[in-house]
Protein backbone atom coordinates (compact mmCIF):
# COMPACT_ATOMS: atom_id res chain seq x y z
CA UNK A 1 0.00 0.00 0.00
CA UNK A 2 2.92 2.34 0.59
CA UNK A 3 3.60 2.30 -3.14
CA UNK A 4 0.25 3.95 -3.91
CA UNK A 5 1.05 7.44 -2.49
CA UNK A 6 4.49 7.32 -4.15
CA UNK A 7 2.94 6.40 -7.51
CA UNK A 8 0.34 9.15 -7.20
CA UNK A 9 3.11 11.62 -6.34
CA UNK A 10 5.13 10.56 -9.40
CA UNK A 11 2.12 10.89 -11.71
CA UNK A 12 1.32 14.32 -10.27
CA UNK A 13 4.93 15.38 -10.86
CA UNK A 14 4.82 14.25 -14.48
CA UNK A 15 1.57 16.14 -15.01
CA UNK A 16 3.04 19.30 -13.50
CA UNK A 17 6.12 18.99 -15.70
CA UNK A 18 3.99 18.60 -18.83
CA UNK A 19 1.92 21.64 -17.90
CA UNK A 20 5.10 23.70 -17.41
CA UNK A 21 6.69 22.78 -20.75
CA UNK A 22 5.17 25.49 -22.94
CA UNK A 23 6.01 28.35 -20.60
CA UNK A 24 9.54 27.03 -19.98
CA UNK A 25 10.27 26.79 -23.70
CA UNK A 26 8.99 30.35 -24.09
CA UNK A 27 11.14 31.52 -21.18
CA UNK A 28 14.25 29.95 -22.72
CA UNK A 29 13.53 31.58 -26.07
CA UNK A 30 12.66 35.02 -24.68
CA UNK A 31 15.79 35.15 -22.54
CA UNK A 32 18.07 33.85 -25.33
CA UNK A 33 19.19 31.05 -23.01
CA UNK A 34 19.01 28.14 -25.48
CA UNK A 35 22.12 25.95 -25.32
CA UNK A 36 23.77 26.40 -28.71
CA UNK A 37 27.44 25.81 -27.86
CA UNK A 38 29.15 23.91 -25.05
CA UNK A 39 32.37 22.17 -24.15
CA UNK A 40 30.90 20.58 -21.02
CA UNK A 41 27.32 20.24 -19.81
CA UNK A 42 25.58 19.24 -16.60
CA UNK A 43 22.95 16.55 -17.16
CA UNK A 44 19.93 16.44 -14.85
CA UNK A 45 16.92 14.19 -15.40
CA UNK A 46 15.15 14.67 -12.06
CA UNK A 47 12.38 16.94 -10.85
CA UNK A 48 12.61 19.84 -8.39
CA UNK A 49 12.67 17.54 -5.35
CA UNK A 50 16.24 16.59 -6.23
CA UNK A 51 17.26 19.98 -7.63
CA UNK A 52 19.61 20.61 -4.72
CA UNK A 53 21.92 17.99 -6.27
CA UNK A 54 22.33 20.13 -9.38
CA UNK A 55 22.14 23.45 -7.57
CA UNK A 56 25.42 22.91 -5.70
CA UNK A 57 27.27 22.78 -9.05
CA UNK A 58 25.73 25.78 -10.77
CA UNK A 59 28.07 28.40 -9.28
CA UNK A 60 31.10 26.22 -10.09
CA UNK A 61 30.03 26.02 -13.72
CA UNK A 62 29.55 29.79 -13.75
CA UNK A 63 33.18 30.13 -12.67
CA UNK A 64 34.30 27.65 -15.32
CA UNK A 65 32.40 29.66 -17.93
CA UNK A 66 34.07 32.86 -16.74
CA UNK A 67 37.42 31.09 -17.23
CA UNK A 68 36.59 30.38 -20.86
CA UNK A 69 34.98 26.93 -20.77
CA UNK A 70 31.64 26.85 -22.59
CA UNK A 71 29.13 25.29 -20.19
CA UNK A 72 25.41 24.66 -19.92
CA UNK A 73 22.68 22.49 -18.42
CA UNK A 74 20.55 19.72 -19.90
CA UNK A 75 17.25 19.30 -18.03
CA UNK A 76 14.69 16.59 -18.78
CA UNK A 77 12.02 17.99 -16.45
CA UNK A 78 10.45 21.35 -17.25
CA UNK A 79 10.22 22.33 -13.59
CA UNK A 80 13.94 21.77 -13.10
CA UNK A 81 14.69 23.68 -16.29
CA UNK A 82 12.73 26.60 -14.87
CA UNK A 83 14.76 26.49 -11.65
CA UNK A 84 17.98 26.62 -13.67
CA UNK A 85 16.66 29.66 -15.53
CA UNK A 86 15.68 31.36 -12.27
CA UNK A 87 18.86 30.54 -10.33
CA UNK A 88 21.60 30.91 -12.92
CA UNK A 89 22.66 32.53 -16.16
CA UNK A 90 23.76 29.23 -17.73
CA UNK A 91 22.27 28.26 -21.10
CA UNK A 92 19.72 25.45 -20.97
CA UNK A 93 18.67 22.59 -23.21
CA UNK A 94 15.28 21.31 -22.11
CA UNK A 95 13.97 18.10 -23.64
CA UNK A 96 12.57 14.79 -22.43
CA UNK A 97 13.72 13.12 -25.64
CA UNK A 98 17.17 11.52 -25.41
CA UNK A 99 17.28 11.35 -29.20
CA UNK A 100 16.79 15.12 -29.42
CA UNK A 101 19.40 15.73 -26.72
CA UNK A 102 21.94 13.54 -28.51
CA UNK A 103 21.29 15.33 -31.80
CA UNK A 104 21.77 18.76 -30.20
CA UNK A 105 24.94 17.75 -28.32
CA UNK A 106 26.42 16.27 -31.47
CA UNK A 107 25.63 19.46 -33.38
CA UNK A 108 27.25 21.77 -30.82
CA UNK A 109 30.26 19.50 -30.30
CA UNK A 110 29.98 18.93 -26.54
CA UNK A 111 33.02 17.04 -25.27
CA UNK A 112 31.95 16.17 -21.72
CA UNK A 113 28.67 15.31 -20.00
CA UNK A 114 28.69 15.64 -16.21
CA UNK A 115 26.36 13.82 -13.80
CA UNK A 116 25.53 14.99 -10.29
CA UNK A 117 23.82 11.90 -8.83
CA UNK A 118 23.25 8.16 -9.20
CA UNK A 119 19.88 8.48 -10.95
CA UNK A 120 18.84 5.49 -13.03
CA UNK A 121 17.88 7.95 -15.76
CA UNK A 122 21.55 8.83 -16.21
CA UNK A 123 21.85 5.55 -18.09
CA UNK A 124 19.64 6.80 -20.91
CA UNK A 125 22.27 9.48 -21.54
CA UNK A 126 25.24 7.17 -21.04
CA UNK A 127 24.42 5.32 -24.25
CA UNK A 128 25.64 8.38 -26.20
CA UNK A 129 29.05 7.69 -27.74
CA UNK A 130 31.58 10.48 -28.25
CA UNK A 131 31.64 12.85 -25.26
CA UNK A 132 33.34 11.81 -22.03
CA UNK A 133 30.86 10.86 -19.31
CA UNK A 134 32.02 12.31 -15.98
CA UNK A 135 30.43 11.55 -12.61
CA UNK A 136 30.62 14.49 -10.19
CA UNK A 137 28.11 13.48 -7.50
CA UNK A 138 26.92 16.30 -5.22
CA UNK A 139 29.00 15.95 -2.07
CA UNK A 140 31.70 14.03 -0.21
CA UNK A 141 30.68 11.66 2.58
CA UNK A 142 30.94 8.09 3.81
CA UNK A 143 27.32 7.27 3.06
CA UNK A 144 26.66 3.94 1.36
CA UNK A 145 25.60 5.75 -1.83
CA UNK A 146 29.17 6.97 -2.32
CA UNK A 147 30.36 3.48 -3.23
CA UNK A 148 27.74 2.57 -5.81
CA UNK A 149 28.66 -0.04 -8.41
CA UNK A 150 27.10 2.40 -10.90
CA UNK A 151 30.36 4.38 -10.89
CA UNK A 152 31.78 1.83 -13.31
CA UNK A 153 29.48 3.15 -16.04
CA UNK A 154 31.28 6.50 -16.32
CA UNK A 155 34.52 7.28 -18.12
CA UNK A 156 35.71 9.25 -15.11
CA UNK A 157 34.50 9.88 -11.57
CA UNK A 158 35.60 13.04 -9.80
CA UNK A 159 36.20 12.47 -6.09
CA UNK A 160 37.21 14.78 -3.28
CA UNK A 161 40.46 13.14 -2.27
CA UNK A 162 42.44 10.13 -1.03
CA UNK A 163 39.70 8.91 1.31
CA UNK A 164 37.26 8.46 -1.56
CA UNK A 165 39.81 6.53 -3.61
CA UNK A 166 40.48 4.25 -0.64
CA UNK A 167 36.76 3.81 0.04
CA UNK A 168 35.97 2.87 -3.56
CA UNK A 169 38.94 0.52 -3.82
CA UNK A 170 37.80 -1.28 -0.66
CA UNK A 171 34.11 -1.43 -1.56
CA UNK A 172 33.70 -1.84 -5.34
CA UNK A 173 35.18 -5.01 -6.77
CA UNK A 174 37.15 -4.85 -10.01
CA UNK A 175 36.94 -1.04 -10.20
CA UNK A 176 39.53 0.68 -12.41
CA UNK A 177 41.04 3.24 -10.04
CA UNK A 178 42.58 5.07 -13.02
CA UNK A 179 39.06 6.40 -13.68
CA UNK A 180 39.09 8.36 -10.40
CA UNK A 181 40.19 12.00 -10.51
CA UNK A 182 40.87 13.74 -7.19
CA UNK A 183 39.69 17.35 -7.41
CA UNK A 184 38.74 18.47 -3.89
CA UNK A 185 35.44 20.36 -3.53
CA UNK A 186 35.01 23.05 -6.23
CA UNK A 187 31.70 24.12 -4.66
CA UNK A 188 33.61 25.61 -1.73
CA UNK A 189 35.82 27.85 -3.86
CA UNK A 190 33.42 30.75 -4.31
CA UNK A 191 32.40 31.27 -0.69
CA UNK A 192 32.61 34.68 0.95
CA UNK A 193 33.98 35.25 4.49
CA UNK A 194 31.35 35.88 7.16
CA UNK A 195 31.07 39.18 8.99
CA UNK A 196 32.44 39.04 12.57
CA UNK A 197 29.98 38.54 15.42
CA UNK A 198 30.03 38.98 19.20
CA UNK A 199 27.97 35.80 19.67
CA UNK A 200 28.89 32.17 18.99
CA UNK A 201 27.21 31.11 15.76
CA UNK A 202 26.02 27.49 15.63
CA UNK A 203 24.66 25.65 12.61
CA UNK A 204 22.62 22.48 13.07
CA UNK A 205 22.37 20.80 9.66
CA UNK A 206 20.98 17.25 9.91
CA UNK A 207 20.75 15.06 6.84
CA UNK A 208 17.57 13.30 5.66
CA UNK A 209 16.42 9.86 6.77
CA UNK A 210 17.50 8.11 3.56
CA UNK A 211 15.58 5.67 1.39
CA UNK A 212 16.89 2.52 3.10
CA UNK A 213 18.25 1.35 6.44
CA UNK A 214 21.78 1.62 5.04
CA UNK A 215 21.19 5.31 4.33
CA UNK A 216 19.49 6.23 7.63
CA UNK A 217 21.94 8.75 9.08
CA UNK A 218 19.61 11.51 10.27
CA UNK A 219 19.82 12.75 13.87
CA UNK A 220 16.72 14.89 13.45
CA UNK A 221 13.99 12.46 14.59
CA UNK A 222 15.80 11.36 17.77
CA UNK A 223 17.92 14.35 18.75
CA UNK A 224 16.71 17.38 16.83
CA UNK A 225 14.50 18.71 19.62
CA UNK A 226 17.17 18.15 22.30
CA UNK A 227 19.82 19.91 20.22
CA UNK A 228 17.73 22.93 19.27
CA UNK A 229 16.18 23.38 22.72
CA UNK A 230 19.57 23.56 24.44
CA UNK A 231 21.10 25.91 21.90
CA UNK A 232 18.09 28.20 21.59
CA UNK A 233 17.90 28.63 25.37
CA UNK A 234 21.43 30.04 25.57
CA UNK A 235 21.64 33.79 24.81
CA UNK A 236 25.32 33.45 23.94
CA UNK A 237 24.47 31.52 20.79
CA UNK A 238 23.10 32.59 17.44
CA UNK A 239 21.61 29.42 15.99
CA UNK A 240 20.58 28.37 12.52
CA UNK A 241 18.65 25.20 11.71
CA UNK A 242 19.15 23.76 8.22
CA UNK A 243 17.40 20.40 7.69
CA UNK A 244 18.14 18.53 4.48
CA UNK A 245 15.63 19.46 1.73
CA UNK A 246 14.56 15.81 1.32
CA UNK A 247 13.76 15.30 5.01
CA UNK A 248 10.48 13.40 5.28
CA UNK A 249 10.43 12.10 1.71
CA UNK A 250 10.90 8.48 2.79
CA UNK A 251 9.54 8.44 6.34
CA UNK A 252 6.25 9.81 7.72
CA UNK A 253 7.84 9.89 11.17
CA UNK A 254 10.76 11.99 9.95
CA UNK A 255 8.35 14.25 8.07
CA UNK A 256 6.29 14.78 11.22
CA UNK A 257 9.38 15.43 13.34
CA UNK A 258 10.78 17.92 10.82
CA UNK A 259 7.46 19.77 10.57
CA UNK A 260 7.25 20.05 14.36
CA UNK A 261 10.79 21.42 14.62
CA UNK A 262 10.30 23.86 11.76
CA UNK A 263 7.19 25.16 13.49
CA UNK A 264 8.64 25.35 17.00
CA UNK A 265 11.95 26.83 15.83
CA UNK A 266 10.85 28.78 12.78
CA UNK A 267 12.93 31.72 14.00
CA UNK A 268 16.07 29.57 13.62
CA UNK A 269 15.52 28.37 10.05
CA UNK A 270 18.57 29.09 7.93
CA UNK A 271 17.83 31.90 5.42
CA UNK A 272 20.96 31.25 3.34
CA UNK A 273 20.66 29.54 -0.06
CA UNK A 274 24.17 28.09 -0.35
CA UNK A 275 24.94 25.35 2.21
CA UNK A 276 28.65 26.12 2.02
CA UNK A 277 27.97 29.75 2.87
CA UNK A 278 26.05 28.60 5.94
CA UNK A 279 29.11 26.67 7.09
CA UNK A 280 31.36 29.69 6.58
CA UNK A 281 28.97 31.67 8.79
CA UNK A 282 29.20 29.13 11.64
CA UNK A 283 31.67 29.05 14.52
CA UNK A 284 30.56 25.47 15.23
CA UNK A 285 28.64 23.05 13.00
CA UNK A 286 26.58 20.09 14.23
CA UNK A 287 26.09 17.61 11.40
CA UNK A 288 25.36 13.98 10.63
CA UNK A 289 27.42 11.79 8.32
CA UNK A 290 26.70 13.82 5.19
CA UNK A 291 28.39 16.25 2.82
CA UNK A 292 27.80 19.06 5.33
CA UNK A 293 30.06 17.39 7.90
CA UNK A 294 32.88 16.80 5.44
CA UNK A 295 32.59 20.33 4.04
CA UNK A 296 32.90 21.63 7.60
CA UNK A 297 36.19 19.72 7.80
CA UNK A 298 37.36 21.20 4.49
CA UNK A 299 36.45 24.71 5.62
CA UNK A 300 38.07 24.36 9.07
CA UNK A 301 34.77 24.84 10.88
CA UNK A 302 34.82 23.09 14.29
CA UNK A 303 32.52 20.08 13.92
CA UNK A 304 30.35 18.11 16.32
CA UNK A 305 29.40 14.88 14.58
CA UNK A 306 26.07 13.16 15.26
CA UNK A 307 25.42 9.44 14.91
CA UNK A 308 27.13 6.32 16.17
CA UNK A 309 27.94 4.50 12.93
CA UNK A 310 31.56 3.73 12.38
CA UNK A 311 33.31 5.93 9.84
CA UNK A 312 36.78 7.31 9.27
CA UNK A 313 35.44 10.75 10.14
CA UNK A 314 33.98 9.57 13.45
CA UNK A 315 37.06 7.59 14.47
CA UNK A 316 39.33 10.48 13.49
CA UNK A 317 37.65 13.15 15.60
CA UNK A 318 38.33 13.68 19.32
CA UNK A 319 35.60 12.23 21.57
CA UNK A 320 34.61 15.76 22.60
CA UNK A 321 33.50 16.34 19.02
CA UNK A 322 31.07 13.39 18.97
CA UNK A 323 27.49 14.35 19.78
CA UNK A 324 26.52 11.17 21.63
CA UNK A 325 23.18 11.78 23.36
CA UNK A 326 23.67 15.57 23.19
CA UNK A 327 24.07 15.92 26.96
CA UNK A 328 25.55 19.22 28.14
CA UNK A 329 25.63 20.41 24.56
CA UNK A 330 25.72 24.15 25.25
CA UNK A 331 28.91 23.88 27.32
CA UNK A 332 30.53 21.61 24.75
CA UNK A 333 29.72 23.99 21.89
CA UNK A 334 31.10 26.95 23.84
CA UNK A 335 34.32 25.07 24.62
CA UNK A 336 34.78 23.98 21.01
CA UNK A 337 34.16 27.49 19.70
CA UNK A 338 36.76 28.83 22.14
CA UNK A 339 39.41 26.21 21.36
CA UNK A 340 38.93 26.23 17.58
CA UNK A 341 39.62 23.46 15.08
CA UNK A 342 41.38 20.50 16.65
CA UNK A 343 44.59 19.13 15.23
CA UNK A 344 42.88 15.82 14.51
CA UNK A 345 40.19 17.56 12.47
CA UNK A 346 42.88 19.36 10.46
CA UNK A 347 44.52 16.01 9.69
CA UNK A 348 41.19 14.69 8.44
CA UNK A 349 40.98 17.58 6.00
CA UNK A 350 44.14 16.37 4.29
CA UNK A 351 42.80 12.82 4.18
CA UNK A 352 39.40 13.63 2.71
CA UNK A 353 40.35 16.43 0.31
CA UNK A 354 43.01 16.54 -2.39
CA UNK A 355 43.15 20.31 -1.94
CA UNK A 356 41.47 22.96 0.18
CA UNK A 357 43.38 25.86 -1.34
CA UNK A 358 40.83 28.42 -2.60
CA UNK A 359 40.34 28.11 -6.35
CA UNK A 360 42.47 24.98 -6.76
CA UNK A 361 39.57 22.51 -6.92
CA UNK A 362 37.77 24.48 -9.63
CA UNK A 363 41.00 24.61 -11.61
CA UNK A 364 41.43 20.83 -11.29
CA UNK A 365 37.92 20.25 -12.61
CA UNK A 366 38.40 22.76 -15.43
CA UNK A 367 41.67 21.12 -16.45
CA UNK A 368 39.95 17.72 -16.63
CA UNK A 369 37.03 18.98 -18.72
CA UNK A 370 39.33 20.85 -21.10
CA UNK A 371 41.44 17.72 -21.59
CA UNK A 372 38.66 16.11 -23.60
Q: Model-predicted segments: where are they?
A:
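A nucleotide-sugar donor-handling region in carbohydrate enzymes
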Residues: 2-27, 150-222, 245
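Active-site and donor-binding regions of nucleotide-sugar-utilizing enzymes
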Residues: 46-47, 51, 59-188
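Conserved catalytic-core segment of nucleotide-activated headgroup transferases in glycan assembly
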Residues: 51-65, 69, 186-258, 354-363
